[in-house]
Amino acid sequence: MTVLTDKIAVVTGAGSGIGEAIATLLHEEGAKVVLAGRNKDKLQNVANQLAQDSVKVVPTDVTKKEEVDELIKMAQQTFGGLDIVINSAGQMLSSKITDYQVDEWDSMIDVNIKGTLYTAKAALPTMLEQSSGHLINIASISGFEVTKSSTIYSATKAAVHTITQGLEKELAKTGVKVTSISPGMVDTAITATYNPTDRKKLEPQDIAEAVLYALTQPKHVNVNEITVRPV
């Protein structure tokens, strides 16, 4: 028997990159997976590689709380419960304050911060009612290490880390777990234009394995934070 048999998982940002790798691994380990993201075609491409009776595609814009609420409801209606929510949707755009790209700042704040909060708001009532569940937020090393071109992005990922820390304290002794995972540079379409040629990258699968590690600890153990760096 696989380790997540019949667990019900929602993964945002599941159409590509880290989210796709997480969704695929959870499905391989027996979970029923709801794939969420903006691009329906990309989500469907991922779903087509998985067993159709244990996957559901729900196009979702995480910056719209009504859509996130509907995503969580759809997961429960389709599979009869909610055990795992992975906040993997993220955005990395121009981040220098002195570039004055306010629209891009707003977009990152909406996706990276508000999206994380909206998903927690939608999922936690069910998890608290059943005294179980696991919320995992994908943050970033950039939340701790700021470069001259990453200021706004780093600030949003630092916020994701802080949100997770606060939730860990709020949810203590409730049976609901929360984890923050902070990867270094990961080889995805998003990072392709940002990465210096001499900088090592992680693979999306590496982050998926970190998620699985957090999810498969004993019931009395909560992994609060994981940092993943390339060697």
From Swiss-Prot:
It comes from Staphylococcus aureus (strain MRSA252). The active site is at 153 (proton acceptor). It comes from the Bacteria. The keyword Transferase does not apply. The keyword Oxidoreductase applies. NADP(+) binds at residues 10-34. InterPro entries: NAD(P)-bd_dom_sf, SDR_fam. Substrate binds at residue 140. This is Uncharacterized oxidoreductase SAR2567. Belongs to the short-chain dehydrogenases/reductases (SDR) family. Its EC number is 1.-.-.-. It is an enzyme of class 1 (oxidoreductase). One of its GO terms (molecular function) is oxidoreductase activity. Keywords: Oxidoreductase.
